[in-house]
């Protein structure tokens, strides 16, 4: 169903939409790592959670995900209405050694050092 405040992101650059969004509803996509840097609320809508874990598996323990895990639409709506949030700081501390906004500089310096040594 169409709704003026819901964007179908199938053909959109998700990173451009991050700045416009207030929260993210995702499955266990790796997009949560990118979005977590923004310190915004996330919800995980996984109606097929048990099948997904059995068939595909998850690289990260789902208990570490920084948001409410919702197995049905009612849980998702309730989580949003109650503003149920996860421990975003703990998640970032586990997965990001550096959180100072200087990662690009570090990568450029690393590449420069590698190139300098190879000449």
Predicted regions, residues:
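Short N-terminal micro-motifs specific to bacterial/archaeal maturation
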Residues: 5-8, 66-67, 98
């Amino acid at each position: 169903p169409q709704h003026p405040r819901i964007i179908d992101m199938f053909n959109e650059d998700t990173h451009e939409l991050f700045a416009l969004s207030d929260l993210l509803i995702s499955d266990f996509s790796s997009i949560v790592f990118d979005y977590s840097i923004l310190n915004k609320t996330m919800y995980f809508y996984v109606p097929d959670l048990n099948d997904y874990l059995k068939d595909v598996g998850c690289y990260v323990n789902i208990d570490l995900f920084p948001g409410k895990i919702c197995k049905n639409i009612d849980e998702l709506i309730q989580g949003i209405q109650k503003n149920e949030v996860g421990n975003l700081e703990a998640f970032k501390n586990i997965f990001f050694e550096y959180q100072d906004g200087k990662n690009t500089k570090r990568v450029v310096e690393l590449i420069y050092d590698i190139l300098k040594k190879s000449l």
